Amino acid sequence: MNSTPPTSPVTRVSDGSFPSISNNSKGFAYRQPQKHKSNFAYSHLVSPVEEPTAKFSEAFQTDYSSKAPVATSEAHLKNDLDVLFTTPRFYSPENLALMFRLSNTVSSLEFLDEFLMGILLAPEMDFLSNPSYSLPSNKLVGQGSYSYVYPISSSASSRCNNDSGVVLKFAKSQHKSKVILQEALTLAYLQYMSPSTNESHIIPFYGLTYITKSHFRRLRSNECVPGLILPKCEMSLYHFNTAVSHKLSLITKRKIWWRLMKQMIDALKSLKTNGIIHGDIKTANILITEMHVLNGGHCKDFDFYLADFTSAFHINQTPTDLNTTVEYCAPELIDSSSDHVPTFESDLYAVGLCLLSFISQHEPYNELQALVSHGSSPGIGSSSIQQSQWLINALLKKDPINLNMLRNDLFQDWKSELALLSRILVDRLPLENLITILDSNYI
């Protein structure tokens, strides 16, 4: 487990679908992978998102049609997948074949490598074969335990400062490449099953490329690491809560809260339809599109997207370890009598805590922990072990609303919202029942 603050790529989301370019792009076309017909047990499920494929940035309207494809990144990816599958953490070849519904095709495992290459790689944005792409060394967007996030600069871009409108989330070192590849497999799968991620509010995935020390000098001379091409967003919900929310009127904040609720429920619905558990939902992993705060405490509409799938896994394969954030854990994930494996229910619980943080403008239990610590209560000490034990004890009380709403005025101002959160965090209402309530009473 971890208790780290924001690690997601804070970048602008474009209405995108993997891996597709607008028909208006000049001489630039991605191949949209075709779904394989199958009698797989879940083939009747229908994605909540059915939209035309989306647009890429105008920066990538470069004509490569006359050039033969360069397989540089492809060779590295094939080798890395072979290594990944020898000791799979989340995805085995057999599991992936089932997920992508290849199990009833002839020699599905033999076809799997070729299939994965087709849905993962972004050949028109291959850093190893196209020198027009670079990573500005002075523009770090974010970083986590496994990765850095930098904007992609393109000399072919018509934008100012060669801004391409996308970012690269890449492994910090070669031995951390597995985590990035697992996230790429999850995002590619979600986008393959639901060709547009706009209405499902899951971060779009534009493909994978490899970089070396020539692109990022902190890498070792012999390292070649994978990176995810993702769209830009304005900020994370964590940043919104700490730096923007206080500037807005209560009416505006309540409107945004309901928008956040609906869009995260849409994301959870899409994940459950496709059998994916996120495993680390928190305010730092919910990204916000371009937002403009207006005079009078108002702001223009914007959207939320669920991001950072480094802990995600498919229900057909149980993860070998738990890598999540303690503050956002459902009680059963830390209870000694449970299996400690994230579920659809624990994902919904984490979304509930994100919505609670939106109201309190504090991370879960952070305000109470600071208050107790400063009051020299015997229940909490200064050591990290004592603080962690205090946090675990607070989680096991199963009273998140009262332990996080420390101002009386919040109960009055957010009465209906807190009543709904009580159904999520205390009654532990299933997602389907929550959707029914929202459809009939709130939306």
Swiss-Prot record:
**In the record, what lineage is assigned to the organism producing the protein?**
Eukaryota, Fungi, Dikarya, Ascomycota, Saccharomycotina
Q: Which family does it belong to?
A: Belongs to the protein kinase superfamily. Ser/Thr protein kinase family.
Give the function comment from the record. Probable serine/threonine protein kinase which may function redundantly with MPK1-independent branch of the PCK1 pathway that is presumed to be required for the tolerance to high temperatures and staurosporine.
Q: Which reaction does it catalyse?
A: L-seryl-[protein] + ATP = O-phospho-L-seryl-[protein] + ADP + H(+); L-threonyl-[protein] + ATP = O-phospho-L-threonyl-[protein] + ADP + H(+)
Q: Which residues bind ATP?
A: 141-149, 169
Q: Which residues form the active site?
A: 280 (proton acceptor)
GO terms in the biological process aspect are: negative regulation of UDP-N-acetylglucosamine biosynthetic process
> Which keywords label this protein?
ATP-binding, Kinase, Nucleotide-binding, Serine/threonine-protein kinase, Transferase
Q: Which GO terms describe its molecular function?
A: ATP binding; protein kinase activity; protein serine kinase activity; protein serine/threonine kinase activity
Per the record's keyword annotation, is Nucleotide-binding included, yes or no?
yes
Q: Which gene encodes it?
A: ISR1
Q: What is its EC number?
A: 2.7.11.1
Q: Cite any additional comment in the entry.
A: Present with 1590 molecules/cell in log phase SD medium.
Keyword Magnesium set for record? no
Q: Using the record's annotation, list all stretches that form the Protein kinase domain.
A: 135-415
* Source organism: Saccharomyces cerevisiae (strain ATCC 204508 / S288c) (Baker's yeast)
The identity of this protein, by name, is: Serine/threonine-protein kinase ISR1
